[in-house]
Curated annotation (Swiss-Prot):
<keyword id="KW-0690">Ribosome biogenesis</keyword>
<comment type="function">
    <text>One of several proteins that assist in the late maturation steps of the functional core of the 30S ribosomal subunit. Associates with free 30S ribosomal subunits (but not with 30S subunits that are part of 70S ribosomes or polysomes). Required for efficient processing of 16S rRNA. May interact with the 5'-terminal helix region of 16S rRNA.</text>
</comment>
<dbReference type="InterPro" id="IPR000238">
    <property type="entry name" value="RbfA"/>
</dbReference>
<dbReference type="GO" id="GO:0005829">
    <property type="term" value="C:cytosol"/>
</dbReference>
<dbReference type="GO" id="GO:0030490">
    <property type="term" value="P:maturation of SSU-rRNA"/>
</dbReference>
<comment type="similarity">
    <text>Belongs to the RbfA family.</text>
</comment>
<comment type="subunit">
    <text>Monomer. Binds 30S ribosomal subunits, but not 50S ribosomal subunits or 70S ribosomes.</text>
</comment>
<dbReference type="InterPro" id="IPR020053">
    <property type="entry name" value="Ribosome-bd_factorA_CS"/>
</dbReference>
<keyword id="KW-0963">Cytoplasm</keyword>
<dbReference type="InterPro" id="IPR015946">
    <property type="entry name" value="KH_dom-like_a/b"/>
</dbReference>
<protein>
    <recommendedName>
        <fullName>Ribosome-binding factor A</fullName>
    </recommendedName>
</protein>
<dbReference type="InterPro" id="IPR023799">
    <property type="entry name" value="RbfA_dom_sf"/>
</dbReference>
<dbReference type="GO" id="GO:0043024">
    <property type="term" value="F:ribosomal small subunit binding"/>
</dbReference>
<dbReference type="Pfam" id="PF02033">
    <property type="entry name" value="RBFA"/>
</dbReference>
Amino acid sequence: MPKTFHRTDRVSAQLRRELGTLVHNAVREHGLPSVSVSDVEITRDMAHAKVFVTALMPERSAEAVAGLKELGYRLRMDLARAMKLRHVPELHFHYDDSVDRGEHIDNILRDLPDTLAAEKRREGDDE
């Protein structure tokens, strides 16, 4: 029976767990805006990893990502100590706006009944 998970999937899950802890500590130590690691995508050759983070305050997301990029080398060294990998991937931090987009869609759907009711009233007034 073939494996259902590739090594890159397992490594990216482990990176997500370890980086979650390291980023949490970095936020406290360096006064960065509060962020959490939402996903890690690793390249097939495991040389690069895209680290997606979400911020509690989306308006400060750029500041948080910039701070994490500055700390990238240190975080990579901490990962090397925590994980048993021959080569720790280079970290590339990105803001994950999927939560913001989901919230926007939720607001649209929540306002939809009011919009439809207003449209029906306008159609009734036109007749």
